[in-house]
Amino acid sequence: MERNQRKTLVGRVVSDKMDKTITVIVETKRNHPVYGKRINYSKKYKAHDEKNLAKEGDIVRIMETRPLSATKRFRLVEIVEEAVII
């Protein structure tokens, strides 16, 4: 599979406590099959962050890759928007 055909997702970093690993929550909206109401869905992914660049609250883009551990199947591509620290 070529790199441009791999899944890419955009989500928010909810945890950066592990070394070289971030937890990203990806939120999507889908229509209910019967009632048609828009429902929010969310799913958490663990992603590889080689240089520990992403911090909690950042909006990041992750890409599917080969299995890096028992739970990691994605890697950090870029930080789309950095979190505002107050």
From Swiss-Prot:
Pfam families: Ribosomal_S17 (PF00366). GO terms for cellular component: cytosolic small ribosomal subunit. SUPFAM superfamilies: Nucleic acid-binding proteins. GO terms for molecular function: rRNA binding; structural constituent of ribosome. CDD domains: Ribosomal_uS17. Keywords: Ribonucleoprotein, Ribosomal protein, RNA-binding, rRNA-binding. GO terms for biological process: translation. The keyword rRNA-binding applies. Gene3D superfamilies: Nucleic acid-binding proteins. PROSITE patterns: RIBOSOMAL_S17. Part of the 30S ribosomal subunit. Belongs to the universal ribosomal protein uS17 family. One of the primary rRNA binding proteins, it binds specifically to the 5'-end of 16S ribosomal RNA. This is Small ribosomal subunit protein uS17. It comes from Streptococcus equi subsp. zooepidemicus (strain MGCS10565). The lineage of its organism: Bacteria, Bacillati, Bacillota, Bacilli, Lactobacillales.
